[in-house]
Amino acid sequence: MQAPFSFMRRAIILCLLVLSPALAAAATDRPNIILITLDTVRADRMGFLGSKLGLTPQLDALASQGVVFEHAYSQAPITPVSHATILTGTFPQFHGIRNFGDRLPPSVPFLPDILHAQGYHTGAFVGSIILDPKNGFASGFERGFDVYNAGFHRQKTGERREASMQRRGEVTLGYVLEWVGQQKGGPFFLWFHLWDAHDPYNPPEPFRSRFPNTPYNAGIAYVDSIVGNLLDYLRSQGLYNNTLIAVAADHGESLGDHGELTHSIFLYDSTIHVPLLLKLPGNRSAGQRVSATASLVDLAPTLIDSLGQTPPPAMQGRSLLPLIANPHPESRPSLATGDHSERSFGWSALVSLRLGNQLYVRAPKPELYDLASDPGAKTNLYTDKRAVAVRLAVQLDSFVKQISEGAPQSLQDGLDEKSREKLSALGYVASGKTSPSTRIDPKDRIDVANDMHDASLAIEEGREATVIPLLLHVVAKDPQVQAAQYYLGIAYSRNGKFGKAIPPLRKAVELRPDALMAQYELAICLYETGDLNTAATHFEILVENRPDWSDARYSMASIYARTGRPEEAAKNLLIVLQGEPDHYRANLLLGRMLFLNGTFDEALPYLEKAVAVQADSGEAHSFLADEYEKLGRAADAANERAEATRLKTSTR
């Protein structure tokens, strides 16, 4: 185990690298480095890894000019964790990113930071909000980047939340090409992330029509075409030859293998075996194939080693370049970790160790597979080969202990409520702080995980009524899954069944008192059923924990207004509007309160703002008409009244 990566050691190493005479002499010849990460792409869909589906002609051509690692493995089947491993060269046990919402500690070595300190221009261009540091995800990933282009936005009225959180590869590529074209007078490091193979699968034409029955495959074919467009541009600009291009998937997709529909739970080859290739400058070692085990944790050290430099001591991966030079390398172990089952469902986490053809999975029901004779990991040999399993278990425990030594304090702040909603829109069960773990084996609950995935998408798409029977089945099977109770409450609430929503929402709050969104929805349902005092108490708790949560504060204020506390209501509405001047309901309520109080001049700007913010609200136009009448503006009042009537008629 290498020593922790201290700030001072990093500074010394970087200074030595920058000041090295050999490096300085070759500075003008330093290659550009492009890292392309393909989200959710299985290894067995690559032509260069044996697929006959014809999905990846561009990647296959690139592979023929580079080095292919036939047995490359991810360290986690989930986007932020795997990308943290790729970019830091450390295992999740060290870098501390274990799930959504965790922050990357500043003391962990970071490839962009290292290259930037050596004079590289650095740019990141990502296809999903999952990797956007500014939206509650991937905090700390911006370190070392001159440009971090994510470009995601708050959901617009009438827009599906999913549409505000991801973008087509062609859109991201447009920003990439613009940035690359601006890089003059020095080498650049580009990280280009493509999200399009991720579910919900929504490939564009003509790929949708080419693969009508397999939208996942269509998404991969589209991603391949985008990679081809980038390569064509590099060639047209004379950049291709002196550019090192690394292509890797962060993880794969189960597609029903072992019962898992997508990814994030299991650690089998469907999600852990990933494509990995390197196109070296000058096409060195073109066409070479490496059969030895490689891991994504090895990628950052490899890129640094390719520059003739020694990776920082805290990087735990090992350069893959010796595997290219040595046709008979030693067998390398590969570790994978799955914490999502624990963080989101309260089940047991999974950890696996792969050594040669043997795969051991530490779980409540341990697993052992001989992948040489059983590549699909269908036959668990744990009982028949207990001695082998025990030996691998000891090695795994030793490995985990070693890579955990010197790890910085984990920064697990968790996600805010809006971020959890965004995750749900992408089909993830939104998770916050670690749930109390049980010894439930995820293998025994994978149907629950699948059902929860489907439920989250159904709710996002407005199909709440259809998903209620499914969620009732889930909570009957495992009532301790907090997200299932929450989704059931949401489904009832959005169908106007507020009374039925209250019990599952109460259970959700009981299971996770820190789950503020569950408490918010519970408060709304209590309000709708007339229990204003209890609802107010819940909103007060929310505002105390999240003072900037405008909707919670507005709801609290609206109860105050209804229960004879107008001063407190007005005070909190003003706080809402200080942070969010265009908050429609706060403007409307405050304006109406001031109007009813007879302070017409004070009411006017709030009512006019409400109409400006939501021009299709008949209620807002009607209230503004009342206001104009009191101010003696008869013509304006008539116009507003007419518009209110028109809107009311058009919605019938």
Predicted regions: what is each one?
Residues 19-506, 510-531, 537, 548-558, ...:
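Catalytic domains that recognize anionic headgroups
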Residues 550, 554-567, 571-592:
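Eukaryotic tandem repeat interaction scaffolds
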Residues 500, 506-507, 531-533, 537-544, ...:
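Tandem repeat domain/solenoid detector
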Residues 612, 618, 622, 626-650:
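TPR/TPR-like (Sel1-like) alpha-helical repeat modules
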Residues 11-19:
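Sec-dependent N-terminal signal peptides
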Residues 2-12:
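Bacterial N-terminal signal peptides that target proteins for export
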